[in-house]
Amino acid sequence: MQAATLSFQPSAPPLQTSAFHFSSKQPNQLKYSLFSYTCPILKRSLLSTQTLSRKSICKPPDVATGKYVREDYLVKKVSAKDIQELIKGERNVPLIIDFYATWCGPCILMAQELEMLAVEYESNALIVKVDTDDEYEFARDMQVRGLPTLYFISPDPNKDAIRTEGLIPIQMMRDIINNDL
């Protein structure tokens, strides 16, 4: 009996899956792909125009953090004490509480959508946010496990609050505000 031998010859070179790779001809030289390079002159000019426009709409940097802070955000950052007063007090509009962190990517995306909702529902809903790094005990008491977490609280004290966790579409937030609160 003869044994059959199979050999495989790839027809195309292997795909490059990384932003950089090592050259087999020169093992110590690192080659960059087209997508990983940004012209330093272009990068510097883009940063300077972005920085100038940001500085023109922001107040001077906060002494503690050194960051520029916009003053015209509709969604205001509040403390745990402020939230407790808002919940206990009488409201004519629903209250939406966003538990977020500054380092959380989905929280940043959600903040943009909440700003759009705040413009859309300016007089029909109150939207506030709580930084879980600053108010970690309050976040723990509110059972915030994942970020971002939203609480939708109806002005009617007989209705249960609605809790969502994770990034949700803006249309879902509209539906909750319009139909469930």
Swiss-Prot record:
Recorded GO CC terms: chloroplast; thylakoid
UniProt KW keywords: Chloroplast, Disulfide bond, Electron transport, Oxidoreductase, Plastid, Redox-active center, Transit peptide, Transport
Similarity annotation: Belongs to the thioredoxin family. Plant CITRX-type subfamily.
Domain Thioredoxin: 72-181
GO molecular function: protein-disulfide reductase activity
Marked site (Deprotonates C-terminal active site Cys) residue numbers: 98
Record-given protein name: Thioredoxin-like protein CITRX2, chloroplastic
Keyword Plastid: yes
Gene: CITRX2
E.C. number: 1.8.-.-
Transit peptide: 1-70
Function recorded in the entry: Probable thiol-disulfide oxidoreductase that may play a role in proper chloroplast development.
Disulfide pairings: 104-107
Coiled coil (UniProt feature): none
GO terms classed as biological process: cell redox homeostasis; plastid organization
Main location: plastid
Active site: residue positions: 104, 107
Residues of the site described as Contributes to redox potential value: 105-106
Subcellular location, record wording: Plastid, Chloroplast
Pfam families, sorted: Thioredoxin
